[in-house]
C-alpha cells in the first residue's frame, strides 16, 4: 500500500519535482562576502561601535569601496548589530 501511494505520487509529481530541482540548482549560491570587503566593513564598525548606524551617504561610500550592493551593506550591518553590538 505504501509503495502504491509512493508510485502514484511520483507519477503525478515527478515532472514538477524535476523542474523544481533544475531551478534550485541554477540559483546563485550564497557565500561569504569577500575578505577585503569584510575588513572594510569591520574597520568602519570599530570606528563607530558606540553608534553603528551608517548614514545613507556612508552606506553608499562603503558600497563603492567594497564593491558590494547596498542591500548587502544593509544586511551586514543588521546582522552585525544583532550578533555583536551591546548598547552602552
From Swiss-Prot:
Domain ELK: 4-24
UniProt keyword Nucleus present: yes
Gene Ontology molecular function: any one: DNA binding
Pfam family, one: ELK
Matching SMART domains: ELK, HOX
Cross-referenced CDD domains: homeodomain (cd00086)
InterPro entries to which the protein is assigned, alphabetical: ELK_dom, HD, Homeobox_CS, Homeodomain-like_sf, KN_HD, TALE_homeobox
Transmembrane segments: none
Record-level GO cellular component terms: nucleus
Cysteine disulfide links: none
Protein's cellular compartments: Nucleus
PANTHER family for this protein: HOMEOBOX PROTEIN TRANSCRIPTION FACTORS
Family the entry assigns: Belongs to the TALE/KNOX homeobox family.
UniProt protein name: Homeobox protein knotted-1-like 10
Originating organism: Zea mays (Maize)
Amino acid at each position: 500500500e505504501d509503495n502504491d501511494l509512493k508510485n502514484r505520487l511520483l507519477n503525478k509529481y515527478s515532472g514538477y519535482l524535476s523542474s523544481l530541482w533544475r531551478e534550485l540548482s541554477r540559483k546563485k549560491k550564497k557565500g561569504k562576502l569577500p575578505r577585503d570587503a569584510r575588513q572594510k566593513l569591520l574597520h568602519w564598525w570599530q570606528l563607530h561601535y558606540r553608534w553603528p548606524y551608517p548614514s545613507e551617504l556612508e552606506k553608499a561610500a562603503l558600497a563603492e569601496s567594497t564593491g558590494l550592493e547596498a542591500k548587502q551593506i544593509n544586511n551586514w550591518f543588521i546582522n552585525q548589530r544583532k550578533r555583536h553590538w551591546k548598547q552602552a
